[in-house]
Amino acid sequence: MMEKTVRRGTRTGFTTGACSAAAARAAVLGLVEGAVPEAVDCLLPNGDVVRFAVNDGACEAGQAAHAMVIKDAGDDPDCTDKAHLTADVRVLPGRAGEVVLCGGFGVGTVTMAGLGLEVGGPAINPVPRRNIEENVRAVGGPLLANAGIEVTISVPQGVEMARKTLNARLGILGGISILGTTGIVKPYSTSAYRASVVQGVQVAATLGHGVVVLTTGGRTEQFAMKERPELPAACFVQMGDFLRYALDEAVAQGLREVVIGGMVGKLTKIAQGETITHANRAEVDTQLLAELAARVGAPPDVCAEIAAAETARFGAERMQALGLGEPFHHALAQAVVQTLTAPDRYGDRFHLTVLVCDFDGSKITEAASGPAATA
């Protein structure tokens, strides 16, 4: 097994990129030494050297070799845990010093611009790409003096695993991405999802519509798609809790329109100034909801109930029962617009529309800012 911290609940793991680099290094050692080792010491992008167990080692007359490393994600609930990161390497006669990296079965193919990867090429991100080559060169020197080495990374379970990722939305088809900026997976880290949100905004920016639609989840995305049917699916990004990263990237990409689709809970947090809306970051400001309720005509006793409640949903349902659901949610949407377009936030860098739906995904209301400033 791979070496890592063993304290329950905090056991780190290794990225698909690190496992691919280890498999490639082991396979190249097979070319050089005539036998694939049962374990290999691999240099990670963060500078650590980690020993990985190697499986299915095989060599073919010094011209080709095969090795596989089983990904251990540690205590992180990663959909690529136990993936078989497989490297097939072969000698390229007459191409001294070249290392050619290819994607095999189960590694996605990039079909859209905006990801920093070649369209038509394998979804192997820049850091793992460099790390794989670095490990290949570290042990392949004797071969590379006179020939090149081709490395093909494949993942037998990659097509199925990719269905649990956002790859298809990002235009990465046919498998998973080979990822990892450090080589290490931290338990319950949000870095991978956060990166996918940023990538989603980047892809949306390449489509020429000048707009990205940010939603908090699947239900709000389906709702938003009904509201903006003229837009392709790649303009919609499930940002989860990561509004700040999505909006910062929208500004960086020069997008002139941003649409946010959400329900009362997340929208309340945004209205109160939170741009990372995870439940652990801040409590819902029910006093704010009570003030909005009062503004649209709720009686004082109801406002007091809303202020004392534990959830935003209580306030929404209480106002709906009074027949004040639409004006209440409209006031909330306006509060979101005012918060995000304040001069010390995003100002007029983009036109903002906030779409509000109920818990069944049906539209309640919307609010919008003034026109965006001319670029």
UniProtKB/Swiss-Prot annotation:
User: Which NCBIfam families does its entry note?
Assistant: cbiD, PRK00075.1-1
Task: Kindly give the SUPFAM superfamilies that the UniProt entry links to this protein.
Answer: CbiD-like (SSF111342)
**What family is it from?**
Belongs to the CbiD family.
What does UniProt give as the signal peptide span?
none
- Which HAMAP family does the annotation name? CbiD
Protein name as catalogued: Cobalt-precorrin-5B C(1)-methyltransferase
Give the Gene Ontology MF terms in alphabetical order.
cobalt-precorrin-5B C1-methyltransferase activity
For this protein, the record's InterPro entries field holds:
CbiD, CbiD_sf
Its annotated pathway reads: Cofactor biosynthesis; adenosylcobalamin biosynthesis; cob(II)yrinate a,c-diamide from sirohydrochlorin (anaerobic route): step 6/10
Instruction: Provide the top EC class.
Output: transferase
Which Pfam families does the record cross-reference, listed alphabetically?
A: CbiD (PF01888)
Q: Does the keyword Magnesium apply?
A: no
Q: Does the keyword section mention Methyltransferase?
A: yes
Q: Which UniProt keywords apply?
A: Cobalamin biosynthesis, Methyltransferase, S-adenosyl-L-methionine, Transferase
Q: Which reaction does it catalyse?
A: Co-precorrin-5B + S-adenosyl-L-methionine = Co-precorrin-6A + S-adenosyl-L-homocysteine
GO BP term (any one): anaerobic cobalamin biosynthetic process
Organism of derivation: Paracidovorax citrulli (strain AAC00-1) (Acidovorax citrulli)
Give its E.C. classification number. 2.1.1.195
